[in-house]
Amino acid sequence: MDENDVPWQNPDQFLYHVMSYAECPPHIRTDLFGQHQNLKWAGNIPSLDMPHHLKSNEWCRFREGVTIGPAKPSHLASRTTEKKQWTYVKCGLPYPVKVPLHIEPFMRVTLKFATEDEPTSWPHLSEQQCEALQVDAVAPSTAREEEGYYWGYTVRRATSLSDVHISCDYPDGYDFSIGTSERGATLDAILPDALAPRSRVKAHGVEQLPPTFDHLLIVFGGVAGLEPAVASDPEFKSKGLTKETAHEAFDAWVNLVQGQGSRTIRTEEAVDFGLFGLKAYVDSMYK
């Protein structure tokens, strides 16, 4: 398929490509994405400015980088690590750093520096100073788990709505799923009692959110809503679900914007409303 035709003939791939590009730190985008027609207008995407989108003069113990080739062991390496294969990683510093691992070129890696303190002469580091930095390649989740950083998002493609559940990476799946629709219950109706407003009128047959969760799924539809996606899904159809019973595919069926006025809300607007509305609920688990 010609690059120019992807947005029209394979819109899922186009969206996957653009969203992955937007999440990637600017200093490694060229190495990982190169030139592509999908990204021709990527400069119009609002800057996400996430914690891992570090500027060259910003220090953080964690950084994202891209491998660029093999390296000699650091002169500060112990006898154990000296025998390992080393790799150069470009991570937005003046010169590449070294990690004691063999990693193929042009692979994205998360780096953890040995110290939280800025190196001497920061940010004007020499090549020798960069090579002397003690760095390890770690799991992308480490920055979040150890320091509480929001370290970006991942983009996963699914062949259908039901496949979102079937191909879920979590062994136990999602604890709770929310389908969004203008025909759903209010967000207040599903909040736990401790977070719900006193004026809430409990809706019959509406399941409340659990007090805690490991993995929460929120599903947003397109212009026509989620009903057509459920009705055309082979897995859901085999269970007898239709447009009229689409809400049964989720634990909760919620209208995020009561009295919206406009007949249609853009999906990207609904995402903002939904995440903002659920923030207090998510935060309550960490207080």
What are these regions (language model features)?
Residues 1-287:
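Post-transcriptional modification and biogenesis factors for structured RNAs
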